[in-house]
Structure formats: C-alpha cells, structure tokens
Amino acid sequence: MKIRALFIVPILVVGLVSCSSDDSASDSSVATGDSVAGTEAPVSEAPTTTVFAPTPVAISGVGETTVEGPVTGGGGQIIFGTATFDGSGFGYTEEEYFISGTANSYTSDQPLTEDGMWNVTPKDTADYKTRILVRRPTTAADFSGTVYVEWLNVTAGLDTGPTWSLSWVEMLRQGSVWVGVSTQRVGVEGGGNKMGEFRVLKIADPERYGTLNHPGDNYSYDIFSQAGATVWQQSDAILGGLVPTTVIGMGESQSAFRMTSYLNAVAPTHDVYSGYLVHSRGMRGANLYCATNCADPGDPSDVKGPEVALIRTDLQRPVLNFSAETDVVGTNLGYRKAEQPDTDFFRGWEVTGTAHGDAYSLGIGDSDTGSGNGDQGLFDAQFGAPSSVYMGIIECGLPINAGPHTYILRSAIHSLDRWV
C-alpha cells in the first residue's frame, strides 16, 4: 500500500501565509542559526488540565449509514497527502469505503452569535453517498484504541488531509487509526477552486467514484456526525474489526472554520466524538445554511456564520484549538479576535514561530518516510530556509517559515489523546 503526494495544487492556496514578512510583529520565520528550542516560550506556571475518565458518547439523533467496501476498481484514493511511504512497512493497511444515508441541514431562528451559544433545528433532508479513507494498524494488537476522523479540506478544489500530513508520524507511533471523510461537495462533485478540479473524485475517476452523490455543504455537518457514528457502530466493517475506545474529530484551516460551526451547532446534541482538534482556524464561523451559496444578501433563509465566532463554553467534550502564529496575527485569518480563555473543556495552543503553511508542509514532508530524513530536512531548512519550493512554483522572495509546526502539532495530538 502506497500513500503518496499526488500533485502540488494545494500548496498554492497556502503559499501566501508561508512566506516571511518584513514586519517583525508578524514574521514567523526561523532565522538562520535558530533551532527549534529557540521558538519555545518562557517557562510559566500552566493551568491544571483535567484528565477525564472516558465517558461513552451518546450518539443522539444521528442517522444510520450503509457501508460499501473496501472499494476497488479504477485508480482510487484521490487525496493530496504528505508522505511517501509503504504503509505495510509500518504494519498499516489503507482501505477506502463508501458510506450513504440521509442527512439533515440546519437552520436557526436567530442570527448566529459571537459567543457560539447557537440554537439550531433541522431544516430539510437529502440523500447522500460519499467516501471515507481509512489508514489503520493491520494487527489488532497494535491498535491504540484511538481513531482520528479528519474533515477533509477542499480549499484547493479537491480533498486534502493537512492535519494527517503534518502529524501522521505521531499517529503511527501511537498505533492509532486515521479516517479522512469527503465531507463537502467540492471534493466529490467539483465546483470549487479550478486548480484542483481535475482531481475531484467523480471527474478524475468516474469508474470508481461515479455513484457518489453529495447534495451540498448545508448537509456537511450531519454527514460528519454520521461518519463518526459509523466508526463507532460499524467498526467491524470499516476498521477491520478494530474496536475504538476514543474517536476524535479534527479539521484544519477551512475545515477548522466548519469544525467551529459544527461544535457550536451540532456537537452538543449529537455527541458523536470523544474530543476535538480545531487546527489553524481563523476568527469566523462557517455558514450554517445557504439557499444559493449565500450569494443573495437579502435571502431570509440564509444562516451565515458570524464575523467572529468563539467556541461555545458549555461543551462537555475536550476541545484543543491549535493555532500557528500566522493564524493569530496574520491578516488572512485573524484568530486573535476569537481568542478565548482556557476552561476545563477548552485549551488554546498558540505556537510562536510557526506558519499556516511552512517548509515542511510545502515540500519537506512529501519525502518524509518516518526514518528521520524529514527531520533532517527541516533542521537543514532552519539554518537556510528556502525562498521557493516545488521547482519554483511558489516564490516568496523571503525565506519560507521552517518552524516547528509539525512537532508541536504532534505533541498536541498526543496530549489531546491523553486528555480525553
């Protein structure tokens, strides 16, 4: 089984937040001669973190799914993901499945508020059929019990798994399972960024994916709930008989915006996931419901995400909000406006010296085999950060950030797994 980077379109989307700036307040590059240790914050007394005894999820109001697979035929497994390695060498198996069901969309009688305390109700339903990609230990004895379910990112016009790409080394060390979910319409049907459209599932491989059907992003929140419930309830079918004890939902960048709205709108009642990683979000919340892509400002049925959205404080599941420095202080994402205090169920990690996209995620990680070569490549970049990557397709003019994003994210995933 080969897990490989298929092409480089997604890097163009994040390239602008990867280059260093002349403004020292927002410059997150690692200067020549700096080390990873040089990015660490001064030691201070941290708040006590509650470690919870595992509490079974309730899975309330979530529709049942039908599972097909493992899927064969065609080329398959169209997803951009860092790392070229033979999974069998790590004792891992990669399989793909289709899940289908009937999903709800959601609406709210009131505008969605900054505090995240949203009250939503189901609006309408639609049938769907999408795909999930599973990377799991081949042998049950090697399984940690934890499953990470990633809301695949479609900013580049196709499915990508950026959190997997930056943290797969830690997941494999744990012996955990990763499940990537084609949650949004663009990854299945197209219609997004034109750069990636030729790798959309149904366009790139109609033989394999032609029967898929995604009714639109209004239904994505319920699809993500149903995918998580499938991991719990049909593990024999999709995990090769592995039995999960913890299922963590995660999403990065654009998917983190949607994870924010998922947490505020759907998570409290569905209670599917044991905990959540919100990775590199901005200040906004994603739209909850759009009649026509929220293009008509006068459409009363639209329920748009607020300009600033905190994560609601009454959640009873741990949430780790992970932010690179450019997520917080950069002009593109502006998470600083949505910062909120830590609580028993919320932790915010803001990682100095890191960028939304960096030298590891934009190239070095593509050749990381887990043998240490990726580490050496990143350490070398810290002493001489590149100003261009991918044969000059991204040209920054200034050094591309070579900070420790991947390492701190791996630590975050390890800590979240212990926390829940």
Positions of predicted regions on the chain:
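Primarily recognizes the serine-hydrolase "nucleophile elbow" in alpha/beta-hydrolase
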Residues: 243-295
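Extracellular mucin-like PTS domains
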Residues: 29-51, 55
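Catalytic-loop region of hydrolases
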Residues: 51-165, 267, 399, 403
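Bacterial signal peptide processing site
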Residues: 20-22
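Glycine-rich, aromatic-lined ligand/substrate-binding cores of catalytic
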Residues: 317, 321-327, 331, 342-420
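Active-site machinery of serine-nucleophile hydrolases
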Residues: 82, 88-90, 94-105, 125, ...
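The feature captures the conserved acid-bearing segment of alpha/beta-hydrolase catalytic domains
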Residues: 280-356
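C-terminal motif of bacterial Sec signal peptides marking the signal peptidase cleavage site
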Residues: 15-18
